[in-house]
Amino acid sequence: MIPLVSSLLIVPTQFELECLSPTFREEIGQTDCHLELCGFGIVVSGLRTSHLIAQHSPKQVLLIGIVGTLDGRFSVGQAVQFDRVTCFGIGAGSGHLSLSADEMGWRQWPTEPVISDSILLRESSCDEQTPYPANLLTCCSASASDQDVRLRLEKHPNAVAEDMEGFAVAAACRFAGIPLTIIRGISNRAGDRNKDNWRVSEAMLAVEKKIRKVLGL
C-alpha cells in the first residue's frame, strides 16, 4: 500500500527536477512530502496530477518549476507564489481574433466545481517580495517572440508570467478538492528562446527558499 503524504510537490520536467539542489531533495526525502514529475504542457500535466492525487491522497499540492516573465514586474531570478492562474489558447481563433472559452459563452467545466478560464489559488497577498497581484498565464505554447508577448498582454494585462502547466494542475486539484500552491522561478523573459540568457539555477534556488518557508523546513 502506498503511504499517504501531507504534501505532493510536482515539477513538470526532468530538466527542472535536476535543477533542484541535492540538499533540497534530501530535505524533502526526510519528510512525509513526495516529489514527482507531472509532465510538460497543459494536457499531460493535468492528467498526471490527477493520477498522482489518486495514488498518494495528499493534503495539498505544490507545483514548482520555472516560468517566463511577461512584463518585468517580477525580475529574472525571483520566485513567485501565484494568486491566480488563467488559461490562454483554448477557445477559437488566434492573435487579435482569439476568443477564450468564457468569451465564447462556455465554461471549461459547467457544474460544481465550476471551472472557467481563471482559477483563484489564494486571496492576493502583496508584500515586499510580491508587490503586485500575481496572475500566472498558462499557455498551450510558450511565447516565441515579443509579438507573442504583446498579444497575450493585450488579452490579459494583469498576467505577470507564463507557463504551460499551472491551469491544468489547478483544474485537477479543483476536481479533487485539494488546495494548490504554485511557486515558480522566473528564469527568463517570455519570448526569449535563447537559453544562454536564462537564469534557471538562480530561479530554482529562489523556489527552494520559498518552498522551505511554506513547508516549515
What are these regions (language model features)?
Residues N158, I178-L180, G185-L217:
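Regulatory input/activation interfaces that engage signals or partners
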Residues E18-S21, D71-F74, G91, D192-R193:
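Short glycine-/acidic-enriched loop or helix-start segments at secondary-structure transitions
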Residues M1-S57, F74:
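N-terminal short beta-loop-beta anion/metal-coordinating cradle
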Residues S6-I10, L62, V80:
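Conserved beta-strand elements of the Class I
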Residues K59-V61, A159-V160:
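Conserved acidic residues
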Residues L70-P157:
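Mid-sequence, gly/pro-rich, charge-dense loop/helix-turn segments that line enzyme active sites
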Residues C140-I182, S187-D192:
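A C-terminal functional module that forms or caps the active site or interfaces directly
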